[in-house]
Amino acid sequence: MYNDGLISLKFKNKTCFKSEYVGFDAIKPINVIIGKNNSGKSQLLNSIEAYLNDKLGDTKYKESFCIKKEIIGKRQESVNQIYDEMSKYSQYLSINRPNFDKMLGTYTFDGEKISRIVDSKSIPLTEYVKDRYNYIATNVLEVRKYWTTNKIFRRINAERDIIPEHDIPSEINVQNITSNGAGITTILSQVYNLKRYKDDDRTIRSDILKAFNKILGKDTSFIRIDVKRITDDNTSLQSKWQIYLEEEQKGLVELDNSGSGLKTILFVIINLLLIPKILNKPLSSFVFAFEELENNLHPALFRRLLSFISQKIIEEKSTLFLTTHSNIALDFFSTEKEAQIVTITHDGNSAMTKTVMSFSDKANIINDLGAKASDLLQANGIVWVEGPSDRIYK
């Protein structure tokens, strides 16, 4: 998304973003949205999803939005048409074609009309030419065509789970994987058990296992991931498919009994590795929105998960929007040049966003989140070992 010409994106609606346009002054590969619970983080992701799916005008959303996007090299036929029209007014606008293309580089769209399309301080334009230019651009460019970016949007909700599921359809459909985790077991059962996928996808199964163990680090190591049919306790006629993790000492362990932290890790891996493989699309074709991945993850494990995600997103030129209220995510991405941190706050009436630029901004975020030194140990106190006697500080 960041490499598809989108420069900035902001939204305004009647529900959450009432007083001002809320969003991003710039789009980076990794965009961390940090704020308290119920501050509007999920609503902002809803707006991004609606933008990418060209649904901002639907009754459900009814949002106006400001968008600034490069259009050079996109729909060149329309650009040529505008230039041909504008050449009639060349006496007012003495520029050649390359300069014209440069001038046409960005536009801002607000609601249902272009509020500014000429973005050039170096080229003087009369008001007549500006008005005529905007009129032509509105009608010839058909700006709605530029709302969408042909990106595939994938989301992981804060409320999520991976559970046993019935049946294995003969065809894989990634649309059946919902943002709360439904469909994960089914798609893995297809990849691991249907012959045509089982024979073709040995590499991806190996990649999934390697990524899983890389994120887990020294905490534990699995030698195999498998999906097997289980029989319901109530009746032998009902059966489900269950994901299993195999450890060398413990044998097969049901994912359903392994804790939600491992489920989150697997969910992320499925989105970043398996779904692009199934769709035969590069990761750069995707925009990901992950919500509160820190839930039920140990801090060190969460850092390794963030490291895995950031490496994939940056190296393969994808885009991530990550919501969090974790100071760990703030620390992790605060020095990453390919990431930005945007705070979202709510005054009781409307949400507001601000891009974090300074150290004091980061300190204010930590205070706003209510983070304490003892959170390092997820405890109410820290034991400092200074000698023969210990003391608990609170």
Language-model segments: residues:
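Extended helical coiled-coil dimerization/tether regions that scaffold
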Residues: Y2-G5, R154, A158-V287
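Switch/communication elements of ASCE P-loop NTPase nucleotide-binding domains
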Residues: M1-D58, S236-D375, I382, R391
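A short, compositionally biased domain-edge/stem linker segment
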Residues: M1, N134-V143, R224-D226, I230, ...
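Coupling/switch segment of ABC-type P-loop NTPase heads
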Residues: K68-D219
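Short beta-strand-centered segment that lines the nucleotide-binding/catalytic pocket of NTP-utilizing
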Residues: G57-F65
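Ser/Thr- (and often Asn-) enriched beta-sheet segments in non-cytosolic proteins
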Residues: S8-K10, G23, S64-K68, T106-T108, ...
